[in-house]
């Protein structure tokens, strides 16, 4: 990772890191910082751990980062076996760039950039924007990523979204930025499909009717639905590929609005994501991740949009606007602070932000106001804090993620909430206040025997979360009580959405739908929560969420009838996203590019096992970024 040339171009320094949840652990045994000849040859270990290495101005030492979180250090080591020594204690600083002339250091701290002299001292110094040990100059606000120096050490560059920014040290402020201008065509299928003979659950005008078309026909041309109706009422175009779906149910693809999907990473971006495949195979065609590494998740999303990777539509808030402590916290003490954070996230591709446990109400209100000005959504972390939740409802956020930590809910809460447009994603699989819903569903099925999960899920991760299961008596599963409270809210007009929380990729959104049914939602109402209601929550209902002419062709074909037995919702036979049709059992493509079933690292000889990933009860869903220098 992070190879860099020495000043004279004769050597390259790089770090070796371990594997990850998307790449496996093969070749993870030898980690650290290494130097090798630029022309090729043997590598020499400089340090046993570290990341982001860079040469000193004379090429005789290497700087690198160690630690993680609030306990990071910038170290330096010679090229001939000298013991590494500390240069800076970093705490809130998350990126350091030494100038080519060795005289200055640029760094980012809590999403702002600074520059200071590089001292020639023998001891370690605390580096931060408020240090008294060095004169520190702010580079600008709305800072982004990839901070680096110009070759002459007279200016600093960085990226914010697709704009390349520069600040000359002699200038009073940064330039306006130059758009990089990289454009890639989005995937555009040109097939025409006719799905014939199935039961079509359209979710059209689903608040007022429960439209089901028996012996229906759905015509898809390219990436859009062009017609839907009964057989005989809809003409099948000449040349269309007819797909017999008699005896099956055709419904909109599932929209998971709270979908954590292995989106924490740095460095090389994997070009295959088994979490995407698992979700798509189970009929999830849209995912919204409300906590992810910004650069990583939007890179993955763009690979899907360009057709370079198979998966659902992927949207995200990027890194959360964290209100507690950490080197990624978002300090919000004014409306301008909030605007700065939201501008940065919007530039990177977010249309939503996650306001996460900002402790003061005025801070949360400032984020809300900035979002209104910028046309963005705000999804609030529920945080198991009832009093905060009620102020969130009053202040008018887009929605609250996770359940209200008390149930049942009484009339005062319901009457207050129904007068707003604030939604709720209860994430019953990880509900607050009692035994989680996921434990209930783990106990009901032998998931380690599920053929589809075994194809799309790393075997060791699947087994460790499904074989030895925690269980309790039926009355102890609190998610059912929470689901009943959600039903009361929905009957009062409060949008209730489906969020699988990444607990079991692909399967968890169905658990969420089934849990809503346990709370009193009819099968249609539970499916509505996972389709058109989710699309409306994300502001995407004009494009997805129902089967209507003109909308994007995101569909799932289910064996059986989930309107009669909601547990059939995960029995997917075919799935279509953006007009591309796949067999659900292996995700081989029908028509179009005719791509074969995807292959994953654990299916190859010596592919290793995933590391740094835990699905199920210990899912790490709010880590802001990976810590490649923590070992």
Can you say where each PLM-predicted feature lies in the sequence?
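Metal-associated gating/positioning segment near the N- to mid-region
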Residues: 249-306, 326-327, 336, 362, ...
């Amino acid at each position: 990772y992070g190879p860099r040339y020495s000043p004279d171009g004769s050597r390259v320094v790089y770090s070796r890191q371990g594997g990850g949840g998307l790449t496996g652990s093969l070749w993870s045994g030898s980690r650290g910082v290494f130097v090798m000849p630029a022309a090729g040859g043997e590598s020499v270990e400089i340090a046993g751990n570290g990341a982001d290495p860079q040469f000193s101005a004379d090429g005789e030492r290497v700087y690198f980062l160690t630690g993680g979180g609030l306990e990071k250090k910038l170290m330096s080591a010679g090229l001939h076996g000298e013991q590494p020594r500390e240069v800076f204690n970093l705490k809130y600083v998350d990126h350091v760039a030494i100038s080519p002339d060795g005289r200055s250091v640029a760094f980012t701290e809590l999403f702002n950039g600074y520059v200071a002299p590089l001292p020639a001292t023998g001891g370690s110094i605390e580096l931060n924007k408020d240090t008294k040990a060095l004169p520190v100059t702010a580079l600008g606000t709305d800072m982004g990523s990839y901070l680096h120096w110009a070759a002459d050490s007279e200016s600093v560059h960085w990226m914010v979204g697709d704009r390349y920014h520069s600040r000359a040290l002699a200038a009073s402020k940064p330039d306006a930025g130059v758009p990089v201008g990289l454009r890639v065509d989005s995937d555009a299928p040109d097939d025409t499909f006719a799905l014939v003979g199935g039961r079509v659950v359209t979710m059209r005008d689903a608040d007022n009717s429960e439209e089901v078309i028996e012996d229906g026909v759905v015509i898809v041309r390219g990436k859009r639905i062009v017609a839907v109706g009964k057989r005989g009422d809809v003409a099948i175009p000449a040349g269309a590929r007819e797909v017999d779906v008699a005896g099956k149910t055709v419904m909109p693809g599932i929209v998971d609005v709270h979908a954590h999907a292995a989106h924490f990473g740095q460095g090389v971006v994997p070009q295959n994501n088994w979490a995407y495949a698992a979700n798509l195979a189970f009929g999830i065609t849209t995912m919204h991740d409300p906590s992810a590494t910004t650069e990583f998740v939007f890179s993955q999303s763009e690979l899907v949009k360009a057709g370079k990777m198979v998966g659902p539509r992927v949207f995200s808030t990027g890194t959360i606007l964290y209100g507690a402590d950490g080197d990624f916290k978002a300090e919000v003490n004014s409306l301008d602070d909030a605007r700065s954070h939201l501008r940065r996230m919007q530039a990177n591709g977010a249309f939503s932000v996650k306001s996460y446990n900002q402790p003061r109400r005025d801070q949360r209100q400032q984020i809300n106001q900035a979002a209104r000005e910028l046309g963005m959504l705000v999804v609030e972390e529920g945080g198991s804090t009832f009093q905060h939740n009620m102020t969130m409802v009053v202040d008018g956020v887009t929605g609250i993620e996770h359940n209200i930590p008390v149930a049942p809910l009484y009339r005062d809460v319901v009457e207050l909430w129904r007068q707003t447009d604030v939604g709720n994603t209860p994430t019953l699989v990880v509900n607050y206040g009692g035994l989680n819903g996921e434990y209930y569903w783990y106990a009901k099925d032998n998931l380690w025997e599920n053929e589809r999960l075994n194809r799309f899920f790393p075997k060791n991760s699947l087994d460790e979360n499904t074989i030895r299961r925690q269980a309790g008596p039926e009355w102890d599963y609190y998610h059912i009580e929470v689901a009943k409270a959600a039903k009361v809210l929905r009957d009062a007009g409060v949008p209730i959405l489906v969020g699988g929380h990444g607990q079991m990729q692909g399967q968890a959104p169905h658990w969420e739908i089934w849990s809503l049914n346990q709370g009193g939602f009819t099968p249609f109402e539970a499916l509505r929560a996972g389709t058109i209601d989710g699309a409306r929550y994300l502001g995407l209902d004009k494009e997805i969420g129902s089967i209507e002419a003109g909308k994007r062709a995101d569909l799932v074909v289910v064996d059986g009838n989930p309107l009669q037995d909601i547990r059939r919702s995960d029995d997917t036979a075919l799935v279509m996203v953006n007009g591309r049709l796949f067999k659900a059992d292996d995700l081989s493509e029908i028509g179009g590019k005719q791509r074969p079933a995807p292959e994953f690292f654990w299916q190859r000889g010596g592919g290793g096992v995933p590391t740094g990933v835990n699905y199920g009860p210990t899912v790490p869903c709010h880590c802001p970024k990976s810590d490649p220098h923590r070992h």
